[in-house]
Amino acid sequence: MADRDVQARAAALRREIERHNYAYYVLDAPTIPDAEYDRLYHELEALEAAHPELVAADSPTRRVGGQPLAGFKPVRHAVPMLSIRTETDTTAAGARAFDVRVRKELGLAPADPPVEYAAELKFDGLAINLRYEAGVLVAAATRGDGETGEDVTQNVRTVRTIPLRLHGDAPPAVLEVRGEVFMRRDDFERYNAQQRAAGKPTLVNPRNGAAGSIRQLDPAIAGQRPLSFYAYGLGEVVGWPDAPATHGATLDALQGLGVPVSAERCVCNGVDDLIAFHDDIAARRDQLPFDIDGVVYKVNAFALQRELGFLTREPRWAVAHKYPAQEQLTTVLGIGVHVGRTGALTPVARLAPVFVGGVTVTNATLHNQDEIDRKDTRVGDTVIVRRAGDVIPEIVATVLERRPQPEPPRFNILQSYPVCPECGSHVVRLEGEAVARCTGGLYCPAQRKQALLHFASRRAMDIDGVGEKLVDQLVSRELVRTPADLYRLPLETLAGLERMAEKSARNLIQAIETSKSTTLARFIYALGIRNVGETTARDLARHFGALDALLGANETALLGVRDVGPIVAQSIAQFFAEPHNLEVVGKLRALGVHWPETTGMQQSGGILSGKTLVLTGTLPALTRDQAKERIESAGGKVAGSVSKKTDYVVAGEEAGSKLAKARELGVTILDEEELLALLGSNKKNG
């Protein structure tokens, strides 16, 4: 037998670990570092291993483990776990109908005071009955048929938010706590991400994840699932002399005993408060960290609950007021694609019409090829479609047991859509990307607005006056199909557009004309090649010097450009391999868009090649962007901070800490005049 000191230490460790468990899992406010928690836990494990007689039913070490079960034993509930009635009207009228029934049963006149109710969430998980004797969790059972459930004690012990021992010195002799085991959305997503990374099966949704975990025959598997629990009522109670007289006070008391209770609850004075609660939760439903399918109203006073009694298997004093379902079953009638403004081809399932999330849904996104493969969704399949709030409906799972025979073929975007359905350009899927894309960025109608706005933007062709509203008009009236069409717009056409008088039209024509004289770097950036930003565009311009040299470069040649990797090289090569894009580039050149060209760094390096510069302060003549462009055109790199690797710091007025750092490190400091002198022999590269 262990001596008293060992017994006392084990008991103290159990209390301390459970206190930290409550703070971490229930309050979400850890009180000690993980390493210290692990030290306490391992100390208790070692004590119990050395003294098996010390192992108690409420020990934290008993949460996870145990032998796999052959099956679940039936458990008869001391107090039946009855279901509550569901109000079919999901509007405010549903709450009013419940209030009318309650007041009628209680014999209240219209002039009598309002009934006090308790309102709470209807969690979307698995109902569980927890039995505590002398404050220790001794059994847990599912609802079952209401009279008899299944013994899931071993699995429930693995749920970290469920206390194995109640707080307080004088718990009731018997206390049955009823509530819901569920899975938070973030825990669900995190678990599925880990499963996918390990190549293991994922869970369909949080509800199935919670129910399936509790009904695992192997408690070790249940212990790996991130489950949570909230209490919402009582079963059998013995020896609780100061038991509360209302439902709301009971939930407060349970919280005081260490049992998790949702904060999303209130005591309501009459039906108007119920409706306000219902509407408030409805507005925030999608922001809650877990799934719910409605709210529950209960007459608050237990004395009135007893007076109202039951109707067959349902209490007259409670009702579930549901929201429109966010998930439903339907059938996939076909799979097509939607071409987005960036050229992404998103697979879309055409569905047999189904009412979900308050609307009739006929289409749902399948996201990308990886998601189609993961869910194995095919035409003819029965699927679970979800629509939450304003979120685009999506297919969350395929019901494989209902797949038609013979099995329909798998869907593959590149096989079904080798060319873009909008413009006929080639469709590709870059290595490492989940999305298939149209390569006709300058030509594709679906990408037209985005391509035009990017082409005219300040850092690209810098056409002042070309904004979203103008582009909307130009595209909707079919005046512009590609960027080349901007250079053909007549004055009278522009002057006839909304909010475009003749003076504005003349200014725009002048801006378009001015933009014809540009730099090769700006022109490359303006083309909107995927993965090619300003810096890469400048690197390409410096390296090749001339557009024709770039057009003739294969992926191997592109990999020779500074900071261009395989994905960027592939993206550039595929863009210029698309005839539609080359056609637009040719038209732009024919319409007078031009730039200075050089032999490129393939044959001659820039004067600042391999040098790193830092800009600080305000320069007298050059803007920061202009200075950066000149430096990069000369082969230099502009960094954001000063280090030992910095070659020059260019300082203007009100230079700050970067200048001080440069002096400290002995870095050469230039003013604007000295920078321009250094760049003097490289002006032709701008």
Swiss-Prot record:
The keyword Magnesium applies. It comes from the Bacteria. It is an enzyme of class 6 (ligase). Keywords: DNA damage, DNA repair, DNA replication, Ligase, Magnesium, Manganese, Metal-binding, NAD, Zinc. GO terms for cellular component: cytosol. Residues 603-686 form the BRCT domain. The keyword DNA damage applies. InterPro entries: BRCT_dom (IPR001357), BRCT_dom_sf (IPR036420), DisA/LigA_HHH (IPR041663), DNA_ligase (IPR001679), DNA_ligase_AS (IPR018239), DNA_ligase_CS (IPR033136), DNAligase_adenylation (IPR013839), DNAligase_N (IPR013840). Its cofactor is Mg(2+); Mn(2+). NAD(+) binds at D34, A35, E36, Y37, D38, S83, I84, E120, R143, E180, K298, K322. Its EC number is 6.5.1.2. Zn(2+) binds at C420, C423, C438, C444. One of its GO terms (biological process) is DNA repair. The active site is at K122 (n6-amp-lysine intermediate). One of its GO terms (molecular function) is DNA binding. It catalyses: NAD(+) + (deoxyribonucleotide)n-3'-hydroxyl + 5'-phospho-(deoxyribonucleotide)m = (deoxyribonucleotide)n+m + AMP + beta-nicotinamide D-nucleotide. Belongs to the NAD-dependent DNA ligase family. LigA subfamily. HAMAP family: DNA_ligase_A. DNA ligase that catalyzes the formation of phosphodiester linkages between 5'-phosphoryl and 3'-hydroxyl groups in double-stranded DNA using NAD as a coenzyme and as the energy source for the reaction. It is essential for DNA replication and repair of damaged DNA. This is DNA ligase. It comes from Thiobacillus denitrificans (strain ATCC 25259 / T1). The gene is ligA.
